[in-house]
């Protein structure tokens, strides 16, 4: 049995320290740099610089570095779904699909062809092993935990994966990198999706989706303006609505509360805590369980977006594999297309795409 481990080296400090720790543990470490998006002429995607940084890390650690492009697979398996969801008026999370289809799909298969016994990443999460099998747990650093993005990966793939920085705080990761002389110890963390980069999101989306203007309306049907297309907005959004002060309305900001696809209308409300922004429950698509599927209702914690605090809820499984999740407290801006991820303590049980939400009554939202 080989003791080779392939580490996904992104050019950032987290994966660099993951490689460092594994080498210190005696593994035969190889780095793998993945290009998942063709860098454009505007320079928003930083893949070229990231590769140079990954190469510098590999040189410092004296480990081989393999470079491979999964751009075609990414476009087919992740980006096309991303566009289709936006066309349908939903708000997808491509990072979840990227982990399932690319990092723990084609990249893991590629690592095995390179003779790896294990695959490793710089994710802030923990894989724990028990007699019952592998489990996905939150990272020690709650502020950096990335288990939300990993819930859709098959547990047998996670079982063969090492995530050595999941036990560390971010500050300790940077300190280890500095002590080891890794050139990326002070590199800024990447933000957003590579193919969007630092550019305005709607500017990027407009390169692929045509405008489809329609009415911006109040819940009572009053026309408040014109939107560019439902694909360019998400629930809870405040910026970019173009609604100023209006006679007969309070001096409060406007927020997107709902998308009416049948009429191509964007429904907006005033006030951050308007009741129409809150949901008491949601319905999911097919649940992806990281352990045996639950058959009976049970109490759990749920996140409906990354970095959200755990929310107390009850999950009711359905015979078709979907579920209904009802919240102890109303949740703001629960968004179809995003993911509801389920936890028991620090353990991630799985999750699913949010399909529909149930509005909360004005009385309960104010409670």
What are these regions (language model features)?
Residues 1-151, 162, 171-172, 256, ...:
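ATP-dependent adenylation/nucleotidyltransferase module used to activate substrates
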Residues 38, 120-128, 132-367:
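AMP-forming adenylation/ATP pyrophosphatase catalytic core
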